[in-house]
């Protein structure tokens, strides 16, 4: 898992008015919470947030905070980014403090490898779950979970229970959940062949 640094500033004032002023000044308001600590209000540069979540790990990147007084050298992951509905610019960020020796729960993207045999025969790929909910130590968070679909035939699916996860990583989704499958040929294609 990628680990990066992010400069922040703590702030004592909170509320909608303060948040609007921060955004007008080109900063993002946020909060750091978790691990039995009182929530701490922060602000940061949008560029710093974008750099911290860049790369394949995205929101699961481990971020070491810099310049935040008591929060200096604290390791966090992004819990949530609230975005403007139209511009998609960050409006607020929630950061969750982690302990490197305690397990965390995160969503990790699924990456499909190969082309399903059933798709080559005219079937339709049904990629039902693009991410999986896992539990592991922060240092073991994978960037993605790879699933080889080359042998997947029409009418078959790969379920959570059939996926092999890296050592120390446990999927907490229902084992019977289908992640990816191949559906039969489209009706008009089947009718044309008949």
Swiss-Prot record:
Record keywords, A-Z: Ribonucleoprotein, Ribosomal protein, RNA-binding, rRNA-binding
GO molecular-function term, one example from the UniProt record: structural constituent of ribosome
Cross-referenced InterPro entries: Rbsml_bL25/Gln-tRNA_synth_N, Ribosomal_bL25/Gln-tRNA_synth, Ribosomal_bL25_b-dom, Ribosomal_bL25_C, Ribosomal_bL25_long, Ribosomal_L25_dom, Ribosomal_uL5_bac-type
GO BP term, example: translation
Tree of life domain: Bacteria
GO cellular component: cytosolic large ribosomal subunit
Subunit and interaction comment: Part of the 50S ribosomal subunit; part of the 5S rRNA/L5/L18/L25 subcomplex. Contacts the 5S rRNA. Binds to the 5S rRNA independently of L5 and L18.
UniProt protein name: Large ribosomal subunit protein bL25
Organism: Trichlorobacter lovleyi (strain ATCC BAA-1151 / DSM 17278 / SZ) (Geobacter lovleyi)
Gene (name only): rplY
